[in-house]
Design a protein with these regions (language model features):
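N-terminal intrinsically disordered/low-complexity leader segments
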Residues: 1-6
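Short juxta-domain linker segments that transition from a proline/glycine-rich
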Residues: 8-11, 18, 22, 28, ...
């Protein structure tokens, strides 16, 4: 089994610490016998250093083992779980530095008791196989932790978007699909194709596909809304301005290759949101709505329309600005999808930056779940479609709802907003997005209509 340099450091450190504990030596004892400093030996055992051959020979003599036994990794049972974990991708891909750690820091914890470490690693590997937990699950969990650490708000990306719009090269033009596309074609030498994806037998569900080159090619699904196309163009501009090289090439994930790729995708999405939906307009519009004593769904959807935003983009943007501008410290976002031919409602996207437990899917046969705001909107769309915007086709007209909820299993209280509409790439199916906040004192001081009598209190559950 091949090992990279870092993994060899980990394995050597594991073996040396194991030998020292078996012999009952202290670091000082080994330092004296091998003529090395205690600090250097400690670095080796932590997997941070790999000594030269003469020092390895001195350590082999100290422990009375052969040189080859010290440097080879095959045929030793107590090393098998460590070797498996190192090659699993977790140690290689997980962004330890994001949390002020290195892989060696975790390794040093595991090597305190080699036998127990082996059992622990075997347990994690078995659980991962049983529940199909892959490295990308850890990477997306790390991204959520990163967002939570920063309250889902990034001033550098806000400023980057505003700086671009104020630049001479943009020239104060309206931020729309046409102008963003033109910028990419002229300044990025992009070739943009809207003919291939929509009718392609396997790629028709993709919003975009990117192919790098001297003249980058961007394939765009022609069935997208102008605002959705503008968002994709905004991400491409963000990729260029932020100097990003490691990126996803498709709108939907096919393979997650690294945390850098996951983080960069988030950063370009954030940039695009800040570019298209400026924080000043969002904060101003929401402040007016939140100051009202009654819930105004038409006004809520009107603000979304004035920002030329899809429900998902609108809710994501609110979530990014909620803490910094409204003092709402935690929230969750969910996107529900319901196919016309099925009763089951799938949770197709979730971002939980709260302590509230969330479901992975809904069934019409579950009484508590039918009372979720987004669930109810999907059920009611047959007669609610088009109420807010009669000028739009009835099937695509968005509908909105606000709700006070009490979780049956935990007693937690939540205030949530939901917007539903038809799916753009599959008009016979519907989707709904939900943005929820814990109903604490901060929320009650910001959203004045939290106790609007017209809003019913609902007892909801996650099953």
């Amino acid at each position: 089994m091949p090992f990279n340099e870092d993994n060899l450091k980990f394995i050597l450190g594991f073996k040396l610490k194991n030998l020292r504990l078996q012999r009952g030596y202290s670091l000082k004892d080994v330092a004296t016998r091998a003529n090395m400093s205690i600090s250097y030996l400690s670095e080796i055992e932590k997997g941070k250093k790999y000594p030269k051959a003469e020092k390895l020979l001195a350590l082999a003599n100290c422990y009375e083992v052969g040189y080859d036994e010290l440097v080879t990794v095959d045929g030793q049972d107590n090393l098998n779980p460590l070797a498996e974990s190192l090659e699993s991708g977790f140690f290689q891909e997980f962004p330890f530095q994001l949390f002020g750690l290195q892989a060696a820091d975790l390794f040093s914890l595991l090597t305190t008791s080699p036998d127990k470490a082996g059992a622990l690693i075997r347990t994690f590997l078995e659980i991962g196989q049983m529940y199909d937990v892959r490295v990308e699950h850890f990477l997306f969990a790390a991204l959520r932790a990163y967002q939570k650490m920063h309250n889902n708000y990034f001033e550098d990306l806000e400023l980057a978007a505003e700086s671009f719009l104020e630049s001479d090269i943009w020239g104060g033009k309206p931020v729309n699909e046409i102008n963003l596309r033109r910028y990419l074609e002229v300044n990025g030498r992009y070739i943009i194709d809207e003919t291939l994806l929509a009718d392609h037998p396997t790629l028709h569900s993709f919003r975009s596909v990117f192919i790098p080159g001297k003249r980058p090619r961007l394939f765009l699904n022609k069935r997208l809304l102008p605002s959705q196309k503008a968002f994709i163009f905004g991400k491409e501009i963000g990729t260029r301005l932020l100097g990003i090289e490691t990126r996803a090439t498709t709108s939907s994930w096919i393979k997650v290759e690294s945390f850098e790729q996951v983080l960069n995708n988030y950063r370009t999405s954030y940039f695009a949101g800040a570019l298209l939906i400026g924080r000043t307009k969002v904060v101003g519009g929401l402040s007016q709505l939140f100051n009202q004593k009654t819930w105004d769904p038409v006004g809520f959807l009107g603000l979304m329309k004035s920002l030329d935003s899809t429900p998902e983009m609108f809710f994501y943007r609110i979530g990014q600005l909620a803490h910094n501008y409204f003092g709402l410290s935690s929230h969750y976002f969910m996107r529900l999808a319901k196919r016309d031919s099925e009763d089951f409602i799938d949770v197709s996207k979730m971002l939980n930056l709260s302590t509230i437990p969330l479901p992975r899917g809904f069934s019409n046969s579950e009484n508590y779940c039918r009372k979720w705001a987004g669930m109810k909107l999907l059920a009611d769309r047959t007669w609610e479609r088009g109420i807010a915007f009669p000028d739009l086709p009835a099937r695509s007209g968005p509908t909105a709802q606000a709700q006070r909820s009490n979780f049956a299993n935990t007693g937690q209280e939540v205030f949530s907003f939901a917007v539903s509409r038809a799916m753009q790439l599959s008009p016979s199916d519907d989707s709904a997005v939900i943005l929820g906040f814990p109903m604490d004192d901060a929320l009650k001081s910001v959203i004045r209509f939290w106790d609007d009598p017209a809003l019913k209190d609902q007892l909801v559950g996650i099953t």
